[in-house]
């Protein structure tokens, strides 16, 4: 998606350790116009798959997921990283490791909001090592829900996440695919 690539080039920053900082439009401050276009792109890609719900992880996946949900006219469910007083029982839970934060988190979704009647689209902000998406796939499996596709905002194609997700047989679509972040230069793969 050319618009997203332009935002990444103009407002993204490469940090040591192949970290891409995109807090100017995705991870801290959100650009609603960009989110709307991303939502439309995900909807266009997955519109014929019978999606009944979109599932993501708090917090940076929520904005793109909501705009995709709006475009597809389906609800959005986000997995919580921390349990609250209102989210204690009847949960589907998976443990995911965050390479950016260097720690594992339990993510949970209420059984009330995900069932075997659902066909879901997983949406996440980044694909690097694939652990977040795999955790959401595990939750979907626990619920008996069908996963029709995985939508990624920014994919670091030089890491193993895509390869791991491809092994599941579930279609993966990334709006921006980064080939390299070496020498603080952002290089993209061609669009899918």
Swiss-Prot record:
**Localization, UniProt:** Cytoplasm
- Binding of 5-phospho-alpha-D-ribose 1-diphosphate, residues: 128-132
Q: Which Pfam families match?
A: Pribosyltran
GO CC terms, sorted: cytoplasm
Could you list this entry's UniProt keywords, alphabetically sorted. Answer: Cytoplasm, Glycosyltransferase, Purine salvage, Transferase
State the pathway, as annotated in the record.
Answer: Purine metabolism; XMP biosynthesis via salvage pathway; XMP from xanthine: step 1/1
Its UniProt entry gives the catalysed reaction(s) as: XMP + diphosphate = xanthine + 5-phospho-alpha-D-ribose 1-diphosphate
EC main class here is: transferase
Residues binding xanthine, per UniProt:
20, 27, 156
Q: Which GO terms describe its molecular function?
A: xanthine phosphoribosyltransferase activity
Which family does the record assign?
Belongs to the purine/pyrimidine phosphoribosyltransferase family. Xpt subfamily.
Record's function text: Converts the preformed base xanthine, a product of nucleic acid breakdown, to xanthosine 5'-monophosphate (XMP), so it can be reused for RNA or DNA synthesis.
Tell me, how does this one assemble? Homodimer.
Query: This chain belongs to which protein, by name?
Result: Xanthine phosphoribosyltransferase
């Amino acid at each position: 998606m050319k618009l997203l690539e332009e935002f990444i080039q103009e407002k993204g920053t490469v940090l040591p350790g192949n970290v891409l900082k995109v807090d100017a439009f995705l991870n801290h401050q959100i650009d609603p116009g960009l989110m709307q276009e991303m939502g439309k792109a995900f909807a266009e890609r997955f519109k014929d798959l019978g999606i009944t719900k979109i599932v993501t992880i708090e917090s940076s996946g929520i904005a793109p997921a909501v705009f995709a949900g709006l475009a597809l006219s389906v609800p959005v469910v986000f997995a919580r990283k921390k349990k609250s007083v209102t989210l204690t029982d009847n949960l589907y839970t998976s443990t995911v490791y965050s390479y950016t934060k260097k720690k594992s988190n339990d993510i949970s979704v209420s059984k009330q909001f995900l069932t075997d009647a659902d066909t879901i689209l997983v949406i996440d902000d980044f694909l690097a090592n694939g652990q977040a998406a795999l955790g959401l796939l595990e939750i979907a499996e626990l619920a008996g829900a069908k996963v029709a596709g995985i939508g990624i905002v920014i994919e670091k194609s030089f890491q193993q996440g895509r390869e791991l997700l491809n092994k599941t047989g579930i279609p993966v679509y990334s709006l921006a695919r980064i080939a390299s972040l070496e020498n603080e230069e952002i290089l993209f793969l061609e669009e899918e």
